């Protein structure tokens, strides 16, 4: 296919193995690659934007293959994509890729994911965007994950990529010959037991460290067509999960089940 202008970001930071593998894979396929990503890890920042302090950027070409332009940014993943589109790029990209994330982005976890937020920022600007994650914090075959991501992205660009569609790709942590299939999936509902570790700093003041433990994964529930497999069940079966996500969060249920709100208080004397 024709060479694409591709913007790549992430939430693991400019030194992460995943983003370098993804940029390398895109370059090998003949595409023009620009990287704008956080200058350090900013996982689980959601779609946060930096409003109370300046954004600073520094060139980081030396961390990537020759021919790749790269910047490390002091902001969030969403900041990085917004800044790239507004200031750093000469022209609007044909494709935005976010990842490869070190760990899964499944189910309702996407609401706090910086990886997904970077792709969502591109989607909001009508640029075809995909978030890519390896569903393990220990598995390091990012080259394989990047190869899968590029093949999917190129096919989607060539065929039909609707406006407002974000593709959320999760790859199981296993070798190529162990992967069974790729399927469209729906989002699961994942819930956590929030565990705060209370500690004391050298000055005697308390502080808290958050670590979430997944205690409930409602694979049978969630969003999307019920005859589609859930993203979590797909990964558990060593299958690639590709979930279509859109920007529209509007309630799709019946008006009859919404709370009854009496607005008489508005004009009350």
UniProtKB/Swiss-Prot annotation:
Cellular compartments annotated: Cytoplasm
Cofactor(s) it depends on: a divalent metal cation
GO cellular component: cytoplasm
Matching InterPro entries: SurE, SurE-like_Pase/nucleotidase, SurE-like_sf
Superkingdom of origin organism: Bacteria
Residue numbers binding a divalent metal cation: 11-12, 43, 101
Main localisation: cytoplasm
Record's catalysed reaction(s): a ribonucleoside 5'-phosphate + H2O = a ribonucleoside + phosphate
Cofactor note: Binds 1 divalent metal cation per subunit.
Signal sequence region: none
PANTHER family in UniProt: 5'-NUCLEOTIDASE SURE (PTHR30457), 5'_3'-NUCLEOTIDASE SURE (PTHR30457:SF12)
Similarity annotation: Belongs to the SurE nucleotidase family.
Protein name: 5'-nucleotidase SurE
């Amino acid at each position: 296919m024709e060479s694409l202008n591709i913007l790549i970001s992430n939430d693991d930071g400019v030194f992460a193995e995943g983003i370098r593998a993804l940029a390398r894979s895109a370059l090998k396929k003949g595409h023009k690659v620009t990287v704008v990503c956080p200058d350090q890890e900013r996982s689980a920042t959601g779609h946060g934007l930096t409003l109370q302090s300046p954004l600073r950027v520094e060139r980081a070409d030396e961390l990537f293959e020759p021919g790749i332009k790269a910047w490390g940014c002091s902001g969030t993943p969403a900041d990085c994509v917004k800044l790239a589109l507004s200031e750093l790029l000469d022209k609007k990209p044909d494709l935005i890729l976010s990842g490869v994330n070190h760990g899964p982005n499944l189910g309702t976890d996407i609401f706090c994911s910086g990886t997904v937020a970077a792709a969502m920022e591109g989607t909001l600007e009508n640029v075809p965007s995909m978030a890519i994650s390896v569903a393990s914090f220990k598995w390091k075959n990012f080259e394989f994950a990047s190869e899968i991501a590029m093949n999917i992205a190129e096919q989607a660009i060539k065929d039909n990529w609707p406006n407002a569609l974000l593709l959320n790709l999760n790859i199981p942590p296993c070798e190529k010959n162990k992967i069974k299939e790729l399927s469209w999936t729906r989002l699961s509902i994942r819930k956590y037991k929030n565990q705060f570790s209370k500690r004391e700093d050298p000055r005697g003041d308390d502080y808290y460290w958050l670590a979430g433990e997944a205690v409930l994964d409602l694979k049978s529930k969630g969003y999307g067509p019920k005859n589609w497999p859930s993203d979590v069940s797909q990964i558990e079966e060593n299958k690639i999960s590709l979930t279509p996500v859109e920007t529209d969060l509007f309630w799709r249920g019946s008006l009859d089940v919404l709370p009854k709100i009496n607005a008489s208080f508005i004009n009350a004397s």
